[in-house]
Amino acid sequence: MRLVVIAVGRLKQGPERELADRYRGRFADIGRNLGFRGLDVHEVAESRARDAGQRIREEAAAVLALAPKEMILVALDEKGKSIDSAAFAEHLGRWRDESVADAVFMIGGADGLSPELRRRARLSVAFGAATWPHQMVRVMLLEQIYRAATILAGHPYHRG
């Protein structure tokens, strides 16, 4: 299974980019041995439309244009379900074992995700009740993907 992160907004050079790259690299090392075909990250430019609804629609169209046709969509959304790392790993492991080709994780921009993307998501995940900037959500998601791989591999990184 290939994992794909599609994020509205760009990570500039700096600590967030360094952390994102670090977790992505760590996942590449362990994920391959677990049957994962990679972890791709695509960035979508933030819409410049004046109207928030129009921005959300434009960003949703850009996200869907990058998403594979056959996939499981996972929304990173403040209204999503809070799940622990072990449950997150269970989802990834189950989808891999079911021969799902692609699992796509969507991170919205400042206005969030469109209602259409929320409806299409198989799973909606929140990293707690707080609202996070998309840069931090991306780093936290990549860390959780890496952590999930270590859980599936029985690696000592996760000591939960």
From Swiss-Prot:
PANTHER family: METHYLTRANSFERASE, RIBOSOMAL RNA LARGE SUBUNIT METHYLTRANSFERASE H. Belongs to the RNA methyltransferase RlmH family. Signal peptide: none annotated. Homodimer. The keyword Transferase applies. GO terms for cellular component: cytoplasm. This is Ribosomal RNA large subunit methyltransferase H. It comes from Nitrobacter winogradskyi (strain ATCC 25391 / DSM 10237 / CIP 104748 / NCIMB 11846 / Nb-255). Its EC number is 2.1.1.177. Specifically methylates the pseudouridine at position 1915 (m3Psi1915) in 23S rRNA. It catalyses: pseudouridine(1915) in 23S rRNA + S-adenosyl-L-methionine = N(3)-methylpseudouridine(1915) in 23S rRNA + S-adenosyl-L-homocysteine + H(+). Keywords: Cytoplasm, Methyltransferase, rRNA processing, S-adenosyl-L-methionine, Transferase. It holds the Pfam family SPOUT_MTase. Gene3D superfamilies: 3.40.1280.10. It comes from the Bacteria. SUPFAM superfamilies: alpha/beta knot. It is found in: Cytoplasm. The keyword Ribonucleoprotein does not apply. InterPro entries: Alpha/beta_knot_MTases, RlmH-like, tRNA_m1G_MTases_N. GO terms for molecular function: rRNA (pseudouridine-N3-)-methyltransferase activity. The gene is rlmH. S-adenosyl-L-methionine binds at L76, G108.
